[in-house]
Amino acid sequence: MKMTSIQQRAELHRQIWQIANDVRGSVDGWDFKQYVLGALFYRFISENFSSYIEAGDDSICYAKLDDSVITDDIKDDAIKTKGYFIYPSQLFCNVAAKANTNDRLNADLNSIFVAIESSAYGYPSEADIKGLFADFDTTSNRLGNTVKDKNARLAAVLKGVEGLKLGDFHEHQIDLFGDAYEFLISNYAANAGKSGGEFFTPQHVSKLIAQLAMHGQTHVNKIYDPAAGSGSLLLQAKKQFDDHIIEEGFFGQEINHTTYNLARMNMFLHNINYDKFDIKLGNTLTEPHFRDEKPFDAIVSNPPYSVKWIGSDDPTLINDERFAPAGVLAPKSKADFAFVLHALNYLSAKGRAAIVCFPGIFYRGGAEQKIRQYLVDNNYVETVISLAPNLFFGTTIAVNILVLSKHKTDTKVQFIDASELFKKETNNNILTDAHIEKIMQVFASKEDVAHLAKSVAFETVVANDYNLSVSSYVEAKDTREIIDIAELNAELKTTVSKIDQLRKDIDAIVAEIEGCEVQK
C-alpha cells in the first residue's frame, strides 16, 4: 500500500533524526548540527544545480559528465542564474559514492566548498554565497582526533544524508528538502533548551505571526525580520502565502555567525533564489542594514528577550532616527523596546509588524512606559496578544505578540487573551490550526468577546498609565466552582444533626459502660 504524504513525512523525519544521532557518536548534537545540516544543504544545491543544467532533458545526466566539457559560457550563465557553480566531479552524489574509500575526504570536501563559494566572486550573488560552508569545518577535532577518524565520521554523515528519500527534482518534491531541514533545526533547538530558542521559532507560532503581519494584504513589497535566527519566521510567510504576494523577497539580519549561515542555507533549501533574499550578519540595534531597502510592508520578529545593549552609553543613539521620536532609549538591561522601535521605523505606511515580546515591557515604568506612551499617542499599537506558556523552546514564559500598524482606522487598542488556547504536547505546548484561526478571527473582526478579546478606547489606556498588559483589560474567566449557598446550608444542617445524634449515641454507650463498672 502506498504511504500518504503525512506518513512519508513522518518516516522521513524518523529516518533523519536517527541518522543525525547515529553519525554524531559521542559528540553533543548541538555541536554537531552544522555537519548534518551542511551535508543536507550540499546535497540540495548539488541536485538543484544538476536539475537546472539538465533542464528536463532526460538524455543528459550532469553527474556523469566530465568536468572538461564545461565551457566558460556555460559556467557564466549558470552563476548568473543560480548564483554559484558546481562541476560534475564536485556534486554531492559523486563525492558521497566514494566517501568510504576516499583517504582525502576531509581535504576534498574543503576544496569543493571553497570552489563553490569562490565561483560567485565578482557576481551579484557573491555576498549570498560567501561563507555558507564556514561552519562545516572538515579539520575540527569534533570529527575525530586523526585524519582517518575525521574521514570516517564525514563519510558516515554523507552516506546517511545520501540515503534519505527526498524525491527527485523532476518530480517537484523540492519542499521535502526544506521540510527536512526545518525538522532538523526544530529538533536541535528543542534539545538545546535556551540556546535553541534563540535561533528558532516553532512553526505553529511562526504561522500565527506571519498571518498577523500579512493580514488583509493582497501583496507586500518585501518581508523583513530584524532578528532572523534560522529564517523560520520569514519562511512561514512563504508557506502561508503565494509567491506573487511577496514581490521583492525576504530580508533579515542575524547577529550570530553560525545561525546567519543556517538562515541563508534555509532560504536556498526552500528554493528561494539568491536574488530573492538578503540575509545580513551584524547587530541590528547598533549596525542596522537595509536602511536603503525600507520601508517594508510586513515585518515579523522574535527578538531575544530582555538582552543587554549599549543604550545610553552610546550618545549617538538618542539621535538615531529609529529611537529619537520616542525621546528615550530602551533600558540598557532590557533591549526589547529597541527592537520594537527599530521595526516601527522600518515599517511602511500600509504595513504591519508582528513582534514577540517579553510581557514585562507592557507594564513596567520608567523609559519603557515613556516608549509605550509614544506608541499609543501616535496610534501605532493595533493589538497586544497574550499567549499560553511554554510555547517556545528554552523558556516556559507566557510571551506576548505586539502588532504595530501605521494605517489604523480608529484609535482603539485591541487586547486578546489567548493564554488558554493551546494543546499540551510532550515537552511543550503548541497552537493548533484551530487556535490560530480563532485568534485571527477576533483579530480581524476587532469584536469584543467575553474573556477573550476587548478593544479599548485610547482614553482608557491613557488613564491606566499606558499599561498594555492584556490582563488589565480582558477579564479572565472565573474557573472557580460555583457554590449554591442554600444547598450548602441544608447539607450543613443535616451534617450537624447527624453529629448531634452520634454524640447522643456515644453518651449512651459511655453511660452504659460506666453503669456496668458500678455494678461490679
What are these regions (language model features)?
Residues M1-L208, L212-A213, Q217, D275-T284, ...:
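Non-catalytic, mostly N-terminal accessory regions of nucleic-acid modification and defense proteins
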Residues L176, I223, S333:
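Glycine-rich, flexible loop segments associated with nucleotide phosphate handling
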Residues H170, D242-D243, L269, F392, ...:
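Generic marker of residues within folded, mature protein domains
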